[in-house]
């Protein structure tokens, strides 16, 4: 360390000790490219990467794949806030399907829209519903107003339907 140090010759012992301690950092292999990539960042650093990408909602209980998807979509959401695409990117990483119906597609007042959110087998909690409303309000266009938020669930199974048509005349035959 004495040959390669960048400190001046009159440095204090504290400065020399600090330089030696900081020199150990150079031996740590850290690829900045991997740290700033949501797909390759170590799982224990994902909360800090989410903070750096300004993720609007974060939950430690999410599976790792959901956390990575939310971080990956954060840039798109911030670039496209105020669009239907941003609303989709906010809701879909949480595992819900979304269908948007805008005012010109039906007879609703101008400047309004409705959302149909399809939940999976897990359902939806009251806290998640409130959080979803907050996220949608943050991502929706400022000139649009949400007038309907429907939560739906598809139930797979078989449905048998049948029909019968009966047509005929009543004929009465009298003797004679």
Swiss-Prot record:
Q: Which domain of life is it from?
A: Viruses
* Triggers of expression: Expressed in the late phase of the viral replicative cycle.
Protein's UniProt keywords contain Zinc: no
Report keywords, A-Z.
Late protein, Viral baseplate protein, Viral release from host cell, Viral tail assembly, Viral tail protein, Virion
Q: Which residues form a coiled coil?
A: none
An example Pfam family from this entry, by short name, is: Tail_P2_I
Q: Does the keyword Lipid biosynthesis apply?
A: no
Query: What are the boundaries of the signal sequence?
Result: none
Q: Name one GO biological process term.
A: viral tail assembly
This entry carries the following GO cellular component terms, namely: virus tail, baseplate
Q: Where in the cell is it found?
A: Virion
Q: What does this protein do?
A: Baseplate protein that may be part of the wedges of the baseplate. Plays a role in tail assembly.
Q: Which family does it belong to?
A: Belongs to the P2likevirus gpI protein family.
Its recorded name reads Baseplate protein I
Q: What is the lineage of its organism?
A: Viruses, Duplodnaviria, Heunggongvirae, Uroviricota, Caudoviricetes
Gene label: I
């Amino acid at each position: 360390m004495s040959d390669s140090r960048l400190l001046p010759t009159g440095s204090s012992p504290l400065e020399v000790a600090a330089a030696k301690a900081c020199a150990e950092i150079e031996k740590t292999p850290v690829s900045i490219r991997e740290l700033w990539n949501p797909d390759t960042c170590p799982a224990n650093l994902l909360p800090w990467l989410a903070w750096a990408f300004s993720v609007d909602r974060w939950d430690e209980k999410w599976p790792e794949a959901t956390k990575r998807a939310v971080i990956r979509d954060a840039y798109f959401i911030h670039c496209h806030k105020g669009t239907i695409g941003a609303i989709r990117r906010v809701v879909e990483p949480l595992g819900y399907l979304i269908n948007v119906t805008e005012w010109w597609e039906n007879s609703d007042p101008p400047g309004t829209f409705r959302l149909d959110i399809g939940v999976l087998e897990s359902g939806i909690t009251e806290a998640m519903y409130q959080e979803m409303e907050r996220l949608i309000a943050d991502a929706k266009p400022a000139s649009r107003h949400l007038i309907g938020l429907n939560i739906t669930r598809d139930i797979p199974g078989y449905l048998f339907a049948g029909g019968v048509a009966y047509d005929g005349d009543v004929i009465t035959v009298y003797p004679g």
